[in-house]
Amino acid sequence: MTNSADSAQPVFSRRSTARVSTDRPSRYGKQLAAHMGRKITTTWDEASQTGSLTFDREGAATGAVELSCHDDILQLHLAADDAHLERLEQVTGIHLARFGAKEGLVVSWIRQEGTPGTTQGPLTPEDLERMRAEREARQGK
């Protein structure tokens, strides 16, 4: 994971929030930050059980997610522009749903105006196998 505390965050026009019910919010928050940190800038603070994901893989940031843990809830606050909001909901949510497939995690986003965003999970073993095969096909394996 890289620390982005010194980098200025751009201002994004759209917001979306997901509250993921789980007995282990800190475990999933830390896992999400560590996994996503291979390709984007992330942080995770064990003491405060908070973190961030900055979607800056291709240079300028296209969105950011703030992670926070509460009693049996992992809360995700996504900020992005119109062009990237739905895709970043999907990318963030599907990773989390995949990590928590055995627990049946569901990530349902609610947009700032109160309208539903995208939903990821719960994932079945068949879903996971299909996703694995699709990923391998994209990577040319």
Regions inferred by a protein language model and the residue ranges of each:
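C-terminal structural segments of small proteins and small subunits
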Residues: 78-118
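Terminal, regulation- and interaction-focused segments at domain boundaries
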Residues: 1-27
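Short, low-order "capping/linker" segments at domain edges
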Residues: 110-139
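Beta-strand/loop substructures that line and gate deep hydrophobic ligand-binding cavities in soluble
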Residues: 59-80
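Beta-strand elements of well-folded, non-transmembrane domains
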Residues: 22-24, 57-59, 80-82
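Amphipathic alpha-helical segments
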Residues: 24-38
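Ser/Thr-rich, low-complexity intrinsically disordered terminal regions
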Residues: 34, 38-62
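Extended Gly/Ser/Thr-rich low-complexity repeat segments
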Residues: 31-35, 67-72, 87-99
